[in-house]
Amino acid sequence: MRLLGELEGWALKHGIREIRTNADWRNHRMLHFFDRTGFELGRNHVIDCAVHGGQIIEGEDDKIFAPEHHRATAELDYGAPAANDFETLARDRSDVRSLAPEDLADLARIDHRITGRDRSEYITRLVDEAMRDSAIRVSLAAHLGGSVAGFVMAKVDIGDFGRIEPVAVIDTIGVDPGFAAAGIGTALLSQLFVNLEALHIERVETVVSRENFELLGFFYRAGFGPSRRLAFVKRIA
């Protein structure tokens, strides 16, 4: 309780008006704690997908952008020959490679085209964290026609939110509307799954607003479904 109070005080000093988290619905002690401390069910859905044996279903991409709820991280060499359908699909669609600092301007441009807002500071912070925070970077950019056509920013969580098993969390995924029908989002997820398999990560999850039907539909077509985890929010005055 005291720690939560300290967190709320810090949040208020920094202009933050709500605290978000999530928990397994079977963790009754944690749910009881959230109930006693004023948390409510959030308006977001936590969805996930098994990496091993998962299936990326091909289809046209639209304006997709995941919410800003985590941070990003990690990097692999994709030079090895294609070993499965995910990798073949990813390479056939576009040139998908590790996110690099020089991609920042393109990421901010794509985000602005999708959201209609200037979130360059937020994107800069995510890219900076992706470059420095972890030895395992799984954030990717898709290049097509000489420019960045889309990106996915993800991290590997070990122990966050009370978990004991490692899981990959997608922070943000965005596709330039000019490449909406080029399968960029599918290619990004395909390569992400390849990389996670190499890291022996068995699940990937993300959080999506329940009103974002386009993004939910995209993830559901890619094999995602409802998670055992529920999103909670506490609004602070």
Functional labels for PLM-detected ranges:
Residues 21-30, 52, 206-215, 233-237:
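Conserved beta-strand-loop-alpha-helix junction that forms the acyl-donor binding cleft
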Residues 44, 150-151, 229:
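Short glycine-/small-residue motifs
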Residues 23-24, 170-180, 208:
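A short, internal acetyl-CoA/4′-phosphopantetheine-binding micro-motif in the GNAT/acyltransferase core
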Residues 90-107:
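A short beta-loop-alpha structural element at the N-terminal edge
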Residues 1-9, 32-36, 175, 181-194, ...:
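Conserved acetyl-CoA-binding loop-helix of GNAT-fold acetyltransferases
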Residues 4, 98-102, 112-165, 171:
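Acetyl-CoA-dependent GNAT
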Residues 11-23, 196-208:
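Conserved GNAT acetyl-CoA-binding A-motif
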